[in-house]
Amino acid sequence: ATLGGFKEEEYTRDCLKAVDDARAYGINTIVDATTNECGRNVRFLKKISDMTGMNIICSTGYYFQAESAYAYWNFRRGFANIEEEIYEMMVTELTKGIEGTDIKAGVIKLASSFNEITPTEEIFFKAAARAQKETGCVIITHTQLGTMGPEQAQLLTANGADPSKIAIGHM
């Protein structure tokens, strides 16, 4: 991943403090829902986990279209089965590891646009439902300003996702 400007020493100090603060409340697991293209850094998360003993669960998935890598996926949609590619990526990151490591995602993160689920976002939701059916993992979502939560749930469950393993965010 390209993470220009990543200040590892400073961020390590900040994260160690955040973990200490969380641990003071009895928290022993943190979910980092940063998506693949939004700066997810699994090696850094593992470093913090190893230093502190905190369980840190990272995600696989993509953010909403306006702030994501969707230009690439929209281009690929013209000549490839991107639902299959996205599904395979998610299952690989959940079962084998991320970016050539043995660090596995523990959740799928999805997002939709304000007042709509775009056609490409819909493909991600369908791929995620398939990946959840295969792996049993939780799907967490992001809604823009609280819109589209029920529609996200309907789309996921219509494609076979287990509603007891779906968390809709920001409603």
What are these model-derived regions, one by one?
Residues 2-34, 38-55, 83-103:
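Alpha-helical scaffold segments that flank or form the walls of functional sites
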Residues 44-45, 71, 118-124, 146-160:
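Distinct, well-ordered alpha-helical segments
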Residues 2-11, 110-116, 139-144:
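Glycine-rich phosphate-binding "P-loop"
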Residues 35-41, 117, 147, 170-171:
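Acidic-and-aromatic substrate-binding clefts and catalytic sites of carbohydrate-active enzymes
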Residues 134-171:
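Active-site core of metal-dependent hydrolases
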Residues 47-50, 55-57, 61-138:
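Active-site gating/metal-coordination segments in enzymes
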